Every structure is written in C-alpha cells, then in structure tokens.
Amino acid sequence: LWMPKLLGRKIVVTVHGLDWQRAKWGNFASFVIKFGEKMAAKYADEVIVLSENVRQYFADTYQRQVTYIPNGISRPVPKEANLITEKYGLVKDGYFLFLARIVPEKGLHYLIEAFRQIETDKKLVIAGGSSQAMEYMEKIHRMAAEDTRIIMTDFVQGQMLEELYSNAYTFVLPSDVEGMALTLLEAMSYGNCCL
C-alpha cells in the first residue's frame, strides 16, 4: 500500500468483508488484517465495498466514505431435476440446500443440529468442499452420518449446481460472518426462499 503511494500511483482497495472477525484467524492474524483495513481506510484513494453493512462500518469506524458496488450475477434459466434425481434421488422442493465452503464461520454445524431436531421428509443437501479446515470437515461428516436425510455432495458445478439451485425447497446459509455471499445471491436469482 505504501510503495505505490510513494511512487504517486492511485490505490483502489476492494473489501469483501470484515475478515478479521472470522474465527479461523488467531489474535495475531486478526490484528494484522485489522491493521491492513485501517491502512486501506486511511491511504487508499478509493475503497470499494460489496455490502451496505460494510459501507456503514467504514463510515462509522473510519469516517470514510466508500463506494458500494454489490456482487453481480446472471439471471439463470431454471433446470429440471434430472442429474440430481439420478445421482441423489432428489426431487423438486424435496430438500433444503446449503452451498458454501465447509468452514466453521459458515455455521453448518448449527444447521445440522437444527435439522436433526425437526420432523420432515425433506432432505438436507450439503454442497461444498473444505478450505483448509479438515478437522471441521471431519466433524461435519460425522454429524451428517447420524441422519440418513442428510446428503453431502462435495463440490458441485455446471448442470448439477444449476439443478440443485433450481429445485431446492429453501436455501440456507447460517453464517456467523459474511460480506455478501455470492451463493446467497445465486440462490435468490433462482427464486429460492432463503434463510
């Protein structure tokens, strides 16, 4: 940040969220990330944020006006349940969908605990891969194995992903910390009810 500034270059910083709040960072890493945020607020020529909450945070915390540019998504064409029926036995409106990286701050453990307490014929589909949190991933696999209604697909893309979004009863993302989740926007673009 300082080197380009010393050379007279313009600096534009995009802030996706308040990463220092994430549980995965220890105290030192959180301090470093927070320090970087302060430097960006003070020295960047322009700061771009992806959510109104982060815009308000910068105004309140640093008295800094920032530019709000939300994530953009394409408007999809919904797909019928074909691959997901063949591979997982899923039907339209027959499942709740969680789609995200499987890391603690996404709150999947809360969702599984809550789902196991409700009586429903609907399934819970967990789609996503781990991101350096193998211990957590193993915990999630153990929790999911205790309920036959829970289906773990691992990472999905292409037609499988489109079918999962298109046919979900409800999309659920119980994150502890979130900037502007692209998966939430995608789920909304398919017309899903979102929690």
Predicted regions: what is each one?
Residues 94, 98, 103-117, 135:
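A conserved mid-protein helix/loop that constitutes part of the nucleotide-sugar donor-binding site
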Residues 155-156, 163-168:
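Short alpha-helical donor nucleotide-sugar binding micro-motif in glycosyltransferases
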Residues 78-90:
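A short helix/loop element that forms part of the nucleotide-sugar donor recognition site in Leloir-type
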Residues 53, 72:
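Carbohydrate-associated surface elements
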Residues 171-172, 194-195:
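A short hydrophobic beta-strand element within the catalytic core of glycosyltransferases
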Residues 176:
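Aromatic "clamp/platform" in nucleotide-sugar-dependent glycosyltransferases that forms part
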Residues 6, 30-46:
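Membrane-proximal helix-turn-helix segments that form the acceptor-binding/catalytic region
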